[in-house]
């Protein structure tokens, strides 16, 4: 989990629009974030396996 101060700093509006970047809505991780869900790969996998993301299934081929 991101520290409370980091989350508060992340929520503040940026001075310049180009400085904004995607972060996970749950843990605040800045890397490997899926834009469509707003989640990092770790949180995405956890929620998908729990069945909390509608329409997401584990791939099988």
Curated annotation (Swiss-Prot):
Annotated InterPro entries? Ribosomal_uS14, Ribosomal_uS14_bact, Ribosomal_uS14_CS, Ribosomal_uS14_sf
Pfam families, per the entry:
Ribosomal_S14 (PF00253)
Q: Does the keyword RNA-binding apply?
A: yes
* UniProt entry keywords in alphabetical sequence: Metal-binding, Ribonucleoprotein, Ribosomal protein, RNA-binding, rRNA-binding, Zinc
**Gene Ontology CC:** cytoplasm; small ribosomal subunit
Give me the comment on cofactor binding: Binds 1 zinc ion per subunit.
Which GO BP terms sit in this record? translation
Which is one GO molecular function term here?
zinc ion binding
- SUPFAM superfamilies, sorted: Glucocorticoid receptor-like (DNA-binding domain)
- Positions binding Zn(2+) in this chain are 24, 27, 40, 43
> Which PROSITE patterns has this protein been placed in?
RIBOSOMAL_S14 (PS00527)
Cofactor(s) the protein requires to work? Zn(2+)
Is Cell membrane given among the entry's keywords?
A: no
Give the family from UniProt.
Belongs to the universal ribosomal protein uS14 family. Zinc-binding uS14 subfamily.
Q: Assembly and partners?
A: Part of the 30S ribosomal subunit. Contacts proteins S3 and S10.
Q: What does this protein do?
A: Binds 16S rRNA, required for the assembly of 30S particles and may also be responsible for determining the conformation of the 16S rRNA at the A site.
Q: What is this protein called?
A: Small ribosomal subunit protein uS14
Per the UniProt entry, what species is this protein from, by scientific name? Thermotoga maritima (strain ATCC 43589 / DSM 3109 / JCM 10099 / NBRC 100826 / MSB8)
């Amino acid at each position: 989990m991101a520290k409370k101060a980091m989350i508060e700093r992340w929520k503040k509006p940026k001075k310049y629009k180009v400085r904004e970047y995607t972060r996970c809505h749950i843990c605040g991780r800045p890397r490997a974030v899926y834009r469509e869900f707003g989640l990092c790969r770790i949180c995405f996998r956890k929620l998908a396996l729990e069945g909390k993301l509608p329409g997401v299934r584990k791939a099988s081929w």
